[in-house]
């Protein structure tokens, strides 16, 4: 049975938790007496300065949370790629052209979802800055050893949010104080912010607890040392991208010439990836024998999951909306849930999985619903007219309005085990949302070895053998395919395509946008509203 994670107590501080800056920096007034009470002892300091920050890891409204909700980080990383598509189905899913705009890379500088994502990331950074200031204020009045650990955890969490900003937006403001007026914030280069994130993780990781964050208990859902080391490996893996301040000139730094100090040793980017992947391995993580264990109802016991968003329909408001919006209405109804009949796999996904051939990857049926579907008792699901519901994967396109398969085109999201006890249309479920897992550690290491001129076959095929997929040689091409096969629907595709230099290429239903061969769409624009507030911010190249 899932146990509550400790920061649920932070609901009593909801008003304090809203202390972020209006438009990422403007502090709201608060009651001083209440604030002093909130930090009067070490336990309260932890709850209010550290644990309260985790209320923002998940979410229930658009653009909030690292995953689980719509029109936020996950959608920007998924529906802008060859992994997923939200077809227009007659009067459904056009939404003012939003989903087509993502898929076609035609989002513009006034996109509400991009702005809301920016504001969400800076909201949590603002809260983190305030927490660090509060922790520093109480130095000498509480246990200093505990304060060091609290500070490290908040710094690591803030670094995680800056990592997403570097990945999504490139050149962004580096805000380290809760009191700086919004108009005075200067813009930093992508590399400057990246270097800051690296330093923060280097300095904070040794002070973090070594517990497995996915396991219920004191550190459930929190940033621990293995989580930080996973993020470190991810930062090093993308070093060529994140240290490039001009991503439109066709020139990238070489990872073999980017160096990091790791435990006193100078290692290039690829060696650094290997070192931190090995560190995560030594922490005791391993591949689960059954791929689906990682996404099961009550998946807290997974030996593979490293960082998760805790889910408990009776305790938390965190939602998983992606299954809900993908399943056909009748399909979801057959589980006693609701659905919105939306998101589907692309034609490119079907080709990568070799769907419809004898060589289909074993993970296809674990990640997608295709063809005839059944309820949990094995009964065929039917449409309202009594005919059998059958998903037609190859009929998917950007606009299928008025087609005979308008409502049934496309393979749908499966991935997570059905929790038929879920509430709020099934969006409140017991399956923790998986952010980081050990299979990624193995594939990161394999890729780093290949990029460094080494052999990465062992790590690649450990992942493949788990699902009885045939042996493959580790090359950059096979590794990119493997990441699609292994991490379908997990929110990594955009970052992977950018790193492999393939994000702007054309594919089914998506011609290359004029001018984007330069790479300008590999980052999103700084929202125009934010730039109007702060004249110091220069728009990213290619956007007007």
Tell me the role of every PLM-derived stretch:
Residues 3, 16-41, 159, 197, ...:
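Bacterial Sec-dependent N-terminal signal peptides
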Residues 8-17:
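Bacterial N-terminal signal peptides
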Residues 22-99, 172, 202, 207, ...:
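An aromatic- and glycine-enriched ligand-binding surface/loop that stacks and positions planar moieties
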Residues 42-51, 55-66, 88-169, 182-217, ...:
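Conserved, well-structured interaction surfaces
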Residues 106-111, 115, 362-461:
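C-terminal substrate/ligand-recognition segments
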Residues 121-124, 196-198, 219, 265, ...:
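Long, intrinsically disordered, low-complexity segments
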């Amino acid at each position: 049975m899932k146990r509550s994670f400790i920061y649920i107590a932070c609901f009593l501080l909801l008003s304090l938790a809203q202390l972020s800056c209006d438009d990422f920096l403007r502090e709201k007034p608060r009651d001083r007496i209440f604030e002093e009470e909130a930090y009067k002892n070490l336990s309260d300091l932890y709850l209010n300065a550290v644990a309260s920050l985790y209320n923002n890891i998940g979410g229930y409204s658009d653009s909030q949370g690292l995953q689980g909700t719509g029109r936020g980080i996950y959608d920007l990383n998924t529906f802008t790629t060859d992994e997923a598509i939200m077809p227009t189905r007659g009067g459904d899913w056009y939404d003012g052209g939003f989903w087509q705009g993502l898929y076609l890379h035609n989002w513009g500088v006034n996109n509400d979802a991009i702005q809301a994502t920016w504001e969400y990331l800076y909201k949590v950074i603002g809260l983190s800055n305030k927490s660090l200031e509060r922790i520093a204020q109480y130095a000498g009045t509480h246990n200093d050893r505990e304060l060091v650990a609290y500070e490290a955890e908040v710094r690591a969490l803030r670094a995680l949010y800056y990592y997403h900003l570097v990945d999504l937006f490139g050149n962004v403001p580096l805000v380290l104080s809760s009191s700086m007026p919004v108009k005075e914030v200067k813009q930093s280069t992508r590399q400057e912010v990246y270097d800051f994130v690296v330093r923060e993780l280097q300095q904070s990781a040794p002070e973090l607890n070594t517990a497995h964050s996915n396991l219920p208990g004191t550190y459930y859902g929190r940033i621990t040392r293995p989580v930080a080391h996973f993020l470190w490996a991810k930062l090093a893996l993308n070093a060529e991208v994140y240290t490039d301040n001009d991503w439109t000139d066709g020139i990238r730094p070489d990872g073999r010439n980017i160096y990091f100090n790791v435990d006193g040793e100078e290692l290039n980017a690829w060696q650094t990836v290997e070192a931190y992947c090995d560190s995560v391995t030594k922490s005791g993580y391993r591949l689960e024998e059954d791929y689906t264990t990682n996404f099961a109802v009550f998946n807290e016991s997974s030996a593979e999951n490293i960082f998760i968003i805790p889910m408990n329909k009776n305790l938390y408001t965190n939602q998983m909306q992606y299954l809900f919006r993908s399943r056909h209405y009748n399909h979801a109804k057959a589980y006693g849930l609701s659905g919105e009949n939306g998101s589907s796999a692309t034609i490119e996904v079907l080709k990568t999985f070799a769907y419809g051939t004898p060589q289909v990857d074993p993970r296809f049926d674990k990640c997608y619903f295709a063809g005839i579907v059944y309820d949990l008792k094995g009964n065929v699901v039917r449409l309202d007219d009594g005919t059998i519901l059958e998903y037609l994967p190859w009929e998917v396109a950007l606009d299928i309005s008025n087609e005979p398969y308008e409502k049934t085109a496309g393979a749908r999201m499966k991935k997570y085990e059905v929790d038929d006890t879920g509430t709020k249309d099934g969006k409140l479920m017991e399956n923790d949302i998986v952010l980081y897992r050990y299979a990624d550690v193995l594939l990161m290491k394999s890729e780093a070895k290949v990029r460094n001129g080494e052999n990465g076959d062992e790590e690649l095929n450990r992942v493949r053998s788990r699902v009885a997929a045939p042996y493959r040689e580790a090359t950059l091409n096979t590794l990119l395919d493997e990441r699609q096969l292994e991490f379908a629907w997990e929110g990594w595709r955009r970052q992977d395509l950018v790193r492999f230099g393939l994000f702007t290429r054309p594919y089914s239903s998506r011609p290359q946008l004029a001018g984007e061969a330069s790479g300008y769409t590999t980052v999103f624009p700084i929202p125009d509203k934010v730039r109007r507030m702060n004249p110091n911010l220069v728009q990213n190249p290619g956007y007007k």
